[in-house]
Amino acid sequence: VKDAIPEMVTAGRRVPMPVGLLTGRRTHLRRLVSWTTAAVNRAIDMLPIGRWLHMRIQRALVFTPLELPLAPRSRGLHGLRIAFLSDLHAGSFMNERDLRRIFARVASEKPDLVLFGGDLINTRERELLLLRAGLRELSPPLGMFAVPGNHDLFWGSDIGLWRSFLVEHGVQVLCNEGVRLSWNGATFWLCGVDDLTEGEPDLRLALAGRADGEPTILLSHHPDYFFEAAASDVDLTLSGHTHGGQIRVNGKAPLHHSKFGYEQGWFVEGESRLYVSRGVGVTFLPIRIDAPPEIPLVTMVAKGEDVTRTEGARRELSLAGNCDDAD
């Protein structure tokens, strides 16, 4: 048995709301938005200019190198590298070939850990199939983990199919769940919460099993959950959702996706840090202005240390948490 295939123990999970209970104005509005988005995406994608615009966006994709200063308690994580992919929106102009090329580029960076920040698909569950070939390109030693975003939950249905597909393809789902990872002799707690707008996030469940003082990384699709994270001694929160505004005019986004201005980049609250990625894909229109797509590459850095790769130390792995059972 490979050391990258861990034994997992229950820590907490999201209990999805039955489809039959999701009635009323909110459900109808969600479906209207989903259908409208899908229709506009497909119509534009059929036009040559739609594909041309999307190709321009993908050529602008950048890997953003980031360094996270480590607190003394986290010094053992020095040199750990994390690739964070958010808002792929598979099916929204993003086809299987695009995704495979993007994932191959991620693999070439040799991250120790790959994290997905939600909105892997756009409006339909069958868009998951577009991810298959790309996911086969990735095999980070500490594994791959994901949380759902609002687009993954647009239909208000059980996320069992979404979860089981990802698990089948090597991605563990952290939906109000946490796992313990070991790297270079040090441990840290990796956890994720449900989407803030379409789901039922519960950080208490996600942190169940965390040891006192243990370094903690949180995945939350929506950045506005950062206040909860900062109040719970979370060292690093990784979020997406905003697309960096997707369209910015004079440095400002006409459409706001965060009530607190968490549009892109670093934010700090006490000892807790948040990074909001601009994401990889687009939705509705294949246009990005002053908000190029990005894949952050986060390197943990202890003060006074050189960031040198330690290949032999990247293979340790143990987890606690259970996210591989489809609901």
What is the predicted role of each segment?
Residues 156, 163-171, 178, 183-220, ...:
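Binuclear metal-dependent hydrolase catalytic cores centered on His/Asp/Glu-rich metal-binding motifs
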Residues 61, 70-83, 172, 178-191, ...:
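Beta-strand-turn-beta hairpins that frame and shape the catalytic cleft
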